[in-house]
Amino acid sequence: MKKLSFLIATALCIMACSGGSDEQPDGPGNGNGNGGGGSTPNPVSFSNPIVGKQLPDPTIIHAADGNFYLYVTQQDNIYIPIYKSTNMTQWTYAGAAFLQKPNWQPDTRLWAPDINYINGKYVLYYTLGHWDLPKNSCIGVAVSDSPVGPFTDHGKLLDYNSGTMQCIDACYFEDNGKKYLFWGSYNSTSKGYEGGIRYVELSADGLSIKGAVSEKIAGPSIEGIMVHKRGNYYYLFGSTGSCCEEERSTYRVVVGRSKNIEGPYVGKNGTVMKENSSYNEVILQGNNLFAGTGHNSEIITDDEGNDWFFYHAWQKAKIDNGR
């Protein structure tokens, strides 16, 4: 895999990694996590955080107009903020995905978007999440002709009946003509629900479940997963630890790989992710500057051939900025 470099925003902020920088310790297409690995990249100069404000759970797409678009979790009454860039390092606010929050699941917030380009449309998967009542969390889907929306909501795709009580953090992936959705999160014995990462095949337009029963692919100790194919391997990235305890956050990114999209995904140490995901290969963790490094985006390749890997983190010196 080509060397990556990272992008941060602070404390609920976004950070990045790109293939051209050896000095970033913190670590195209269609937003599908499938691609990259082009010719020798031209180095990029940047420093983290690249966006120093509250922008958790990033997802990014290289759009048909040549620009890059970044989408993040709801901020106040901005229902999935969208940012635009020509170079992956300088971002400007471009609007919100929704003018009004989808109202089919009350008392929830818009979390963890996942942007994709499917059949000539921009397709946005999103979570309507409830922190204290995970049974109320659901995944929906919306569509737009433009990367900046507004997106038309197509309603609920998945809820707790899908096989995991924590129905959050969707990740779309297309492979060999089939479309898949991955999702899930932790167990919580104190709240009485079972977690885990599951996947299911989608319809041709990506807007409904094809009908197959969902399958478990990773254990209940990771969330914010992302699937990427490079060469003959599929890579399953996920975040484990605590996300939201400011400088005490232990969020970190782990990864396993498989020769089949259905798994099993295995880390370098031989740990099978379906059994114990949190003990897989750690590729990104906090340091003396940042804590809670996780919920990474797709791997995106820029026009110069550099691979970028975006994630959020708490900047210890500026905790009030968020992650």
Tell where the protein language model's regions lie, with residue ranges.
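Positively charged n-region of N-terminal signal peptides that target proteins for export
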Residues: M1-L4
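Bacterial N-terminal signal peptides
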Residues: L7-M15
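Carbohydrate-active catalytic/glycan-binding domains of CAZyme proteins
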Residues: S18-R323
